[in-house]
Amino acid sequence: MQELHLLWWALLLGLAQACPEPCDCGEKYGFQIADCAYRDLEAVPPGFPANVTALSLSANRLPGLPEGAFREVPLLQSLWLAHNEIRMVAAGALASLSHLKSLDLSHNLISDFAWSDLHNLSALQLLKMDSNELTFIPRDAFRSLHALRSLQLNHNRLHTLAEGTFTPLTALSHLQINDNPFDCTCGIVWLKTWALATAVSIPEQDNIACTSPHVLKGTPLSRLPPLPCSAPSVQLSYQPSQDGAELRPGFVLALHCDVDGQPAPQLHWHIQIPSGIVEITSPNVGTDGRALPGTPVASSQPRFQAFANGSLLIPDFGKLEEGTYSCLATNELGSAESSVDVALATPGEGGEDTLGRRFHGKAVEGKGCYTVDNEVQPSGPEDNVVIIYLSRAGNPEAAVAEGVPGQLPPGLLLLGQSLLLLFFLTSS
């Protein structure tokens, strides 16, 4: 029995001192070190002692890091992977290394990196990712790296960086972002402002320069001239008609998204109806209301007609088209959105009392209300409903404008006799 006990302890001791054959393992300066550098390795070898705190795999031929690559060494504090052939770091390759303080991935070919793995590395103090093929860094990539002191992103292929990328790095003292092909458009202006104001050391600032546009090529970011830039704004309203559109019989709903911003924002319609969600990211019809060539629609006249001028037309509006219609605008400086809930109602649901002589709809961000004369009035808590008469497409048989026969008020939708369309306006 005693011999079995000794054998068990011997086995445990042997496991504790195990080391992959190509590597050297030992203790130095109080650290358990595994040195696998310059071993011509093409994969991370298995069999490391679980108590390893420093691992060098530099100067090998590793092509990538798969999920769980370092699961055997959860106590790692330093990991050196420079000068390999790494192109991809898979999700889960680094996520288990919650004690990691130093990570060197420099001088590789990384273009595909699992940025979400960094969210678990809250102890990280040094991150070297220079001399790779990175083209994009998510805005929240460094959100958990509150202990990070040094970040090296120089010599990559970064064209821009999202505003706020470095905000979580409250301990940062050293940043290298030189020698990237930055596009000096509105989206990069924040970086110039931040770099000039921050206490973080940013060396080689003359090499943080523009690659495009051509007129600014070679200009250091610190000397970037003022650019005409503004974040998007949107205003969602209704239109009485759509000039030039060939409308089929039925009810017609017309919405218009007025977009402003510099550079010109991209417009996107998000429609939530009973049957699901419809996304429209570009115009799908011409001015005649017919589908543009190449538009993936089932017929020559789409159910939801998105025009290049920001208008959206639903030629056959009914119960199946009830829902939330959202207009989104995005450019390099951000995004803006405005929404409207649309439902059919019959007369007698409060229409006459609410309509009165004028009708209202909440403007974007509560800035005011639009009346039949398109005047802006102060918005109040009661201004959350617009009641609009509907009539069949075509010439109306009767007018509804403030009792004046034959005249329609500006802004009224012609959508179906004796029906009411309720707009519950919201904006975000």
UniProtKB/Swiss-Prot annotation:
Superkingdom of the source species: Eukaryota
TM segment ranges: none
Localization of this protein: Secreted
Entries under PANTHER family matching the protein: IG(IMMUNOGLOBULIN) AND LRR(LEUCINE RICH REPEAT) DOMAINS, IMMUNOGLOBULIN SUPERFAMILY CONTAINING LEUCINE-RICH REPEAT PROTEIN
Disulfide bonds: C257-C327
Protein's recorded name: Immunoglobulin superfamily containing leucine-rich repeat protein
Pfam families: LRR_8
Ranges of residues in domain Ig-like: 232-343
Positions of the LRRNT domain: 19-50
Domain LRRCT: 180-231
Residues with attached carbohydrate: N51, N309
Sequence ranges of the LRR repeats: 51-72, 75-96, 99-122, 123-144, 147-168
InterPro entries xrefs: Cys-rich_flank_reg_C, Ig-like_dom, Ig-like_dom_sf, Ig-like_fold, Ig_sub2, Leu-rich_rpt, Leu-rich_rpt_typical-subtyp, LRR_dom_sf
Gene name for this UniProt entry: ISLR
Signal peptide (from-to): 1-18
A GO CC term assigned to this protein in UniProt: extracellular region
Keywords: Disulfide bond, Glycoprotein, Immunoglobulin domain, Leucine-rich repeat, Repeat, Secreted, Signal
